[in-house]
Amino acid sequence: MSKRPTQLVQTNTPSDGLVRLWMLRILVKLKAHKNFLDVMGYENSAIASYLGLQRAEEFCDETIDTSSLEFNFDAKKALAAMRQGHLRAEKNSANYHVQPELTQNIKRLSEVVLLNQVEIDLLQFTVILNTHSLLDNVADYLGGMSSTELYRTLTVLLGHSERD
């Protein structure tokens, strides 16, 4: 999960819903929002825009001097909005899919090397993580972790039980 310059990502691809779900799981369920939200707003406005979050200015406290908007950003309100977005994404998760071409290629590979569903999901996530710069940037908010933490993170992120 290397730091790349933020760039615009093609939207309206078949996997956009799934990518947004993974991003929101990282930010909300895995608490990476602590590195994404600060007193000045969103750490990365391209991520906020991709997730459909309101502009940072809309979470500012109107009672504070508006000449210093960057210092009155209400991260709690922004987090509440992210949580709502996460709940909506989870509710619609059955409708999210990986690009058909990737699904077909991984299916062929899984037949050759006999991958189970968890391994298929890990491979799909890894491929998309390495091709989607904003997902990669969000994953960077998790920081370094031990192998045990990585295992737990992937379990939460991909929606599997720890026994899987």
Stretches found by the model and what they are:
Residues M1-D164:
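Intrinsically disordered, low-complexity N-terminal extensions of AAA+/P-loop NTPases
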